[in-house]
Amino acid sequence: MGGTALRTFEGRTIGWALCGSHHTLALVLDVMGQMCQAGAEIIPVVSAALAGTTTRHGTGEEHVRQIAEVAGRAPLTAIPEVEPFGPQRTLDVLLIAPCTGNTLAKLANAVTDSAPLMAAKAQLRNGRPVVVGLTTNDALGLNAQNLARLLVAKNIYFVPFGQDSPHTKPTSLVSHFDLCPDAVLAALEGRQLQPLLRSW
């Protein structure tokens, strides 16, 4: 991030929702740390899939602890904890990264059964920006209709993405998570960071 980003994040409250894409967590946390250092106040929100699942990438408890260390506060994990984001107008922007295909589909269809989705609903209630950082194997498959719905939705923006493995996983899309800071800044200005489609 350059000097402009460093200045702009001062005084900004950013909700950061993390879903169950365990293999991208280390990269996402590195970017979160950069944004904290740039002056952002990060309020982490974690899905049950991330907080309660053990994979080869670690346990849910380990992930929650790592997120708390980077953000400087314990993640919110329950729907009642994030529901006040709406009436209290807590967030300047909500970033969902990583956003799984499951969360993408539910967001597109107004399903609110997790803390990240409740945070998004609360944010959209206030007409404030939600930024989506994708990582899903079916974005160009069965989830394509949900992606299309969100691409044209008001106040929803995306971290630029591309096909990470077009020959072995032709329907997969992954956002360039290093662009999260720029995507957030653009969303705060009411615009989509361009170009949206970027190769890997």
Give short role names for the model-derived ranges.
Residues 1-130, 135-200:
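A cross-family phosphate/adenosyl-ligand binding-site feature
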